[in-house]
Amino acid sequence: MTKQTDKQIENINFDYSTYGDGKAIIEILNIGFEPLLLPDEYKIYKEIGNLKYLRNGILRTLKFINSKLLYVDEDDCYYKWLMHHKLCLEEKLDFYKEKEKYKEQIFRSLMQRNKSKTRKIYSNRDFKSEEQFRNIAIFESDLNRCFGCKDMEHSDDIISVVTYYTEIFDSIIHNGFDYKGRHFVFFTAGAGQTRCKKSTFVNEKLLNKNFNRLFCGLTPEIINEQGGMNTNKYLAYTSLCQTNTELWKNFNIDRAIVVDDIEYNIPDQKVRYIYTESPDDKKQMKYLQEEIEKCNEQLKEIKTKKQNRPRGFKRPQTEIIEERNIQNRRKALREDIQKLKSKYHRSEVRTMPVTIPFTDGFGISLRKIESSMIRLPFIKGLIAYCPRRAFVDWCSANSIPIHKVVDIYGKSYSINEIDYIFTKSQFKMWKYYNNVLDENGNIIKTGWEIYKENFKKYGCDACRCNVERGVKLNSKTNYQVLQTLTTEMTDDDILSLASYDINCLNGIGRNVQCMLNVLGANEKKNDHMNWLQKSLILYPEMLKDFYVKTLLKNTKDSMIKNFRSGKFSINGAYVFAIPDTLACLQYWFTDMDKTDLSKFGFVKDGNVSCRLFQNQEELDCLRSPHLDHAHCIRKNQVNDQTKTWTKSNGIYIGMQDIMSKLLMYDNDGDKLLVHNNKTIIKCAKQYQRKHGMIPNYYDMPKASPELISSDSLYNGIVMAYHHGNIGTPSNEITKIWQTLSPDSTEEEIQHAINVIALRCADVNFTID
């Protein structure tokens, strides 16, 4: 190696991530339940493992013997030897099963007895799999920034725990555990973690030191003083600081306010109304169940009396009549319960007003920034830029005065005093930051001012994630998008849809551009190219390299598998769903007639505005999971007027559009797949002409608040373990779509649509 080369190598600068850019990777410990078992529990657990090993060995031997017995004559001595051996093994198998069951009971009772003990991590054990004790990488977040974690370094202050046994989880959530001389306590478990039975435990000393910084001075004690809250919501909001984020530079909390959400009714909308349990229904159900329990207790007492009497004793007539009356009452109560239940899970098509939460999770920045999701303590959602000067000029041109806006705590602000407008739906804990009043009931300090004081006092951070930095029209369909068109899509349509991918596939080995496209080396379609892809663009001759040839072969095989699962390339992109920003400012800052929604905003009824596509192009808006037929086809509106307001690559949606009810999305950062594929749009239009497209509409009941404690958090998480699976209803919906075809009758299709609507409601209830 030459001196010059050595010098070049020495000059290579291996840069680490800059603090706060969101790109840092931190290594932490991830454990299962085995390291947390106490010595006596671990001993029994290993014995159970050995018994399972022996049992599985016997099962393999029995399988081998049974396969041999098929080909051996019954009179053969070898057959008799095999049968004798089989009987001995079956006896052993039964013995091991019973012993394993007995040991399992001992194991469970031991864990139950040890729930009050403080556990510790035993790292020197012979674990069943590496999943039980291994290091994992997590991305930079507000939590690990607070804890001083550094890029590409291991941190012993955050531990991810996967718990299979609820007894162990019960123990550690109440008592914590010890590791390397530090005590760890339960921190949180977000929705994504709960689905995987994961939870985050952190160094108690560091948590106490940074608690106010992470949660802006709001403690469980303050929440409990005001009646508590739903525990799973609390976990979701406290886990916001675990999101992979970058610091929001130049953010000034003093230039931010929180206003009421924009919500209104659109009259005379045709919907599929699904009845859900109301608070009165809950009370009625509870009353009926309690009355049935009383009847059961009374009948049990009568039965005990009968059993204690001598044989042949004649029962009093009054007792017989009383027993019959109680039985009849119990029967009537059960019928009432069935009547009450029969109202649930039924749908009917109605014409009724539909409530549109227009700014659900959405806020506006009057300073120029990229559209992004935001994370502040207990604040989350989407924020998009709307130019202040353009709005002021619009009001001036239309002779509309701009008045002050009132925040949710009653304080007024002019448009020049603020840069960031958050909404109540974004500020998750707004009700726990109360106004401070004097003796006469006058406001001394608003709840938002208290939040801002705490934010600055404790050094809280404003963060961003999913920042919009370039969107390419390069997306793929999935099987769900196609299955909802199964009654309309023909073989020719599928061939037309797959034509681009087929050409790319056939071009491998023949066409350089096709091969570059297949490998993702296309600047127009790939915004995140790696070094190999960039090199291929500069030097396409690298396609002859053995490694690249192997990569092409593997990519081709992968493409074929993707085709079989319905993944076809389309001219589309996943973009933020953004409410009409002009309409929002008009609603908050002017006295325009709020009963005439047609005058609000720049996006008119039946249109959307997305600058990625041409003016007057037909666009299909989709959302995942795409379970029912929800293809929202709209005309794209792009002109000189819209360009003033569309400062993002997102899709802007007008006030009169009920798309949010069809696609069931929120405006807190949900992305829609927006495309202009003519084949899909043609099939979707055919479907809607024949069978219609009616949004599901229901009132989702709210969970009751609870006091925040280790007990309530444990109960909430364990309940989520058992009731948080959306896979089952989603798979059932797929099976229903598979029963349909272009030859299906209208009656069959409408019945399927009705059943799918009910299962979609189940999925949404499970998610929320």
Predicted regions, residues:
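Conserved small-residue
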Residues: 1-662, 681-684, 702-768
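A short beta-strand element within the Helicase C-terminal
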Residues: 671-674
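Compositionally biased, low-complexity linear motifs
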Residues: 676-703
